[in-house]
Amino acid sequence: MAVLPPDPVFTLRCPEMGAVNSLCFHQNERLLAGTIKGSVFLWDLQTNRSLLHFAIGKEPITTLHHTEDMLISQEKGGAVTLWTLGNSGYKRHFTINANYVGYCRSVLHANTNADDDHLLFYPCEENSIGVLHLNDVENPSQILVPDDAQLPKLGTLTCFKPFECASQLFVLAGYESGHFLTWDLSSGMVVDVLQMDADPMCLDYDPLANRGIVGGPCK
């Protein structure tokens, strides 16, 4: 007999919220929920009440991240927006129109080689990766474009994972074709190509154990 899951400790409900598409915590006492209607709801986990909500756009919110004082949202369609937190709520600070229509989610990475620097990795165009330093958003993003003629046909970018090895920063990226490219951020070059099953949907990698896992539509 299957073991039933435990009952929730509490349930957060709001008639205006609707279906939730993404979640992230802020300082362990607040939960932000991005909805398919394009809004963000901020919940206080001490009172279980929604402190505020605001509209980002009309597209579903696919990903949310939060630093100490900044919210990052990614919408279906690729728009990535940075929001600053003030006394009156969140204010739009910077928007990147990444022009990406797939399901790959952005990733926030704490740069251990520089204090107080977070790197935002986001999908852009069909198969490129943008890299933005959050402490200097006015500078153009670094764009990793797989335009080497020797590379196989990749299709759409579907997932990626930044990781550090020997004090160097790399990105392992999966594509529709099932190819996985390892990018060296210092040079912006591909240093390894691996062929696996087509249509990877998510991945994780532990550089210490040198082990990774890939999830797809069938397994």
Task: Label each residue range with its predicted role.
Residues M1-M17, T47:
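A short helix->beta-strand "capping" segment at the edge of beta-propeller domains
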Residues T11-G38:
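Beta-strand-rich domains and repeat architectures in extracellular enzymes and scaffolds
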Residues L12-P15, F54-I56, T95-N99, V145-P152, ...:
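Surface loop/turn motifs at the tips and blade-to-blade linkers of beta-strand repeat domains
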Residues M17-F25, E59-H65, Y100-N111, Q150-E164, ...:
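Canonical WD40 repeat/beta-propeller blade segments in eukaryotic WD-repeat proteins
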Residues L31-T35, L71-E75, L119-C124, V171-G174, ...:
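Conserved beta-strand element within WD40/beta-propeller blades
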Residues K37-S39, D69, G78-V80, N127-S128, ...:
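Loop/turn residues immediately N-terminal
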Residues V40-D44, V80-L85, I129-N135, F180-D184:
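WD40-repeat beta-propellers
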Residues N87-L119, P123-G130, N135-A149:
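Asp-box/WD-like beta-propeller blade repeats and closely related beta-sheet repeat scaffolds
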